[in-house]
Amino acid sequence: MMQQTFDLRLATLAANYRNGNTTPRALLAAIRQRAEALNPEFNLFIHLLSEAEQAPFLAALEGHSPETLPLYGVPFAIKDNIDLAEIVTTAACPAFAYRPTQSATIVAQLIALGAVPVGKTNLDQFATGLNGTRSPYGRCRNAYHPAYPSGGSSAGSALAVALGVASFALGTDTAGSGRVPAGLNNLVGLKATKGVISTAGVVPACRTLDCVTFFSATADEASQLLALVARSDQQDSYSRRNPQWNSRQAFGRPSAGFRFGVPQTLNFLGCRASEALF
């Protein structure tokens, strides 16, 4: 299982591209090979893009660099309830599958910024579930303890980042789907305010609550990604302009003291096994 691993942090990738240590084409080919080796055990991808399917995205990078495209050559994964043009969307239900003619707004934004899709990731069917086990495409396994669940519903997206085949991944969150698998796989799961990231082109679970989320290795990278894509979108009736307080420029230590609470006891509803795992 231990294939070649890569440092896919945004700053490191940009430096490696500038220094000529690798190219987007070479990196994506190596990542595809690693993903193919991992998928039989972890079931993280429903569809891995082939070399031919990735070719247009790589061709669009010609003449560019990290200086002209902030996500130049950055590999990312897409939960398979979010549209990528001409690649089948299943929402983990083969009978529902369709081939979209255009990408979801968020996917189109990221591609325009230079990011390259790796594949469509596995999920609890129709994004309904928090385990990562309710999919006809196989049960997703935890990146650190394969006998444990990955969490869901954005299971494959979390695994793509945790297993080193994507710098970041897109998920969705209606009731925890973008945060639970992040927590179970040692990642940051960013669910922004409803409407800050467009959900146009997303198969709905609950339209009034659905949010597109980011999985990333660090909070700083999640913040960078949010700052790049937070835009209002006329195709999304729930879209809103990004307020200044949601910008990474507004982050920092509070001038006054900050108080937070930690419960003295945790209630696991009588489940001793869960208490022991915690």
Describe every region a protein language model picked out:
Residues 191-276:
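A short helix-breaking turn/cap at a secondary-structure junction
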Residues 2-174:
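Gly/Ser-rich catalytic/binding loops embedded in alpha/beta enzyme cores
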Residues 132, 174-200:
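Glycine/threonine-rich beta-strand-loop-alpha-helix active-site module
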Residues 8, 22, 26, 101, ...:
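Conserved active-site and cofactor/substrate-binding residues in soluble primary-metabolism enzymes
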Residues 131-134, 149, 171-174, 184-185, ...:
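A structural signal for the main folded, soluble domain(s) of proteins
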Residues 69, 179-182, 250-255:
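Short glycine-biased active-site loop of nucleotidyltransferases that positions the nucleotide triphosphate
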Residues 125, 176-179, 211, 268-270:
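Flexible loop/turn segments at secondary-structure boundaries
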Residues 48, 161-162, 189-191, 215-217:
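Short beta-strand-to-turn element immediately C-terminal to the catalytic PLP-Schiff-base lysine
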